[in-house]
A protein has these predicted regions:
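Non-catalytic connector elements of ABC transporters
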Residues: 1-69
Length: 69
């Protein structure tokens, strides 16, 4: 699959948490480095995401969001 985004990180899905409208996906791209993405439930179902599966975290500079816990 080709993508225009240059920041692509292959990794392993650690967790998939489905909410009312949004699914949060945690992808470990290196030991101890985890990206969390919020996607629609429909997208998560289409991608058939599951813990232990392989996925890419794709980051576009114009689409980076910042949050704190």
């Amino acid at each position: 699959m080709k993508r225009s985004a240059r920041n692509q990180f292959p990794g392993t899905i650690l967790d998939v948490h489905k909410g009312a409208t949004t699914t949060h996906v945690k992808i470990e791209v290196a030991p101890g480095i985890v990206f969390t993405a919020a996607i629609t439930n429909e997208a998560a179902e289409e991608l058939d995401l599951a813990k232990g599966g392989k996925a890419y975290a794709v980051v576009k500079a114009s689409d980076v969001m910042v949050g704190v816990e």
